[in-house]
Design a protein with these regions (language model features):
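Single conserved hydrophobic/aromatic residue that forms the stacking wall/gate
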Residues: 1-6, 10
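Conserved, well-ordered alpha-helix/loop/beta-strand core segments that scaffold catalytic motifs
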Residues: 14-76, 202-206
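Catalytic core of nucleotide-activated saccharide and alditol-phosphate transferases
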Residues: 103-106
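Extracellular serine-dependent O-acyl
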Residues: 44-52, 67-100, 121-124
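Extracellular/periplasmic envelope-modification machinery, especially enzymes
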Residues: 114-206
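Short glycine/proline-rich turn/loop motifs
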Residues: 12-16, 96-101
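Short active-site-adjacent helix-start/loop capping segments
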Residues: 9, 56-59, 96
Length: 206
């Protein structure tokens, strides 16, 4: 494998390093989540999904002396959340699907496939009916290189960016971008496909 200060490359996968489990830091974050939930109307359901990244799910690709502590972090958060919060645990589901490309090879984000697999778990947990809807995955870019590639200077690999859309959907929705004071009828910003960071196609970025 190849190693740099920014990221590591193991078995053709760029994997960012992770901080070791810090109980004090995680406890503070968990308290903030509980505080938020306490200020939400009692009739509003609060659901929380903590998503592991590639270093944890692809742990089998790491050298024997490199271990992930994300499971410890997730268990701590789960055990210390208030009863008002439903914790949706997708860790095992993602682990069970490691044969699929759950995370980009050149970026720290998960792929549309990874997000979709987690969504199915979330939908079951909160009672959403997804059986009546079929989805299609469509490639919108085949030359994506993410921040992991930029950070370590390895540009020999490319990722496909796919979007997921309901098949034969008759529904409609509006995405309200509060900070930009604009509304759109789509989750995708196709203008971003002409930029270097094609991941911005999803709602224009963070």
């Amino acid at each position: 494998g190849y190693s740099s200060a920014a990221s590591d490359v193991y078995k053709r996968q760029l994997i960012a390093g992770e901080e070791e489990f810090n109980e004090q830091k995680v406890e503070e974050l968990t308290k903030s989540i509980n505080k938020f939930a306490a200020n939400v109307d009692k009739n509003v359901d609060v659901n929380f999904m903590l998503v592991p990244n590639a270093v944890s799910i692809y742990e089998a690709k790491l050298p024997y002396n490199v271990k992930s502590t994300q499971r410890d972090t997730m268990d701590f958060v789960k055990d210390n959340l208030s009863d008002k919060i439903r914790f949706v645990d997708v860790y095992d589901t993602l682990k069970d699907n490691v044969s699929q490309q759950l995370y980009y090879k050149t970026d720290h984000h998960w792929t549309t496939r990874g997000a979709f697999i987690a969504f199915t778990d979330y939908a079951k947990a909160v009672g959403l009916d997804t059986d009546s809807v079929d989805y299609d995955f469509m490639s919108v870019a085949g030359d994506f290189q993410g921040t992991q590639a930029s950070n370590c200077g390895i540009y020999s690999s490319y990722d496909n960016v796919n979007i997921c859309v309901p098949r034969n959907s008759k529904g409609s929705y509006v995405v309200n971008y509060i900070e930009k004071t604009e509304k759109k009828a789509t989750l995708f910003d196709e203008s971003k496909l002409g930029e270097k960071d094609k991941y911005l196609v999803f709602m224009g970025g963070n």
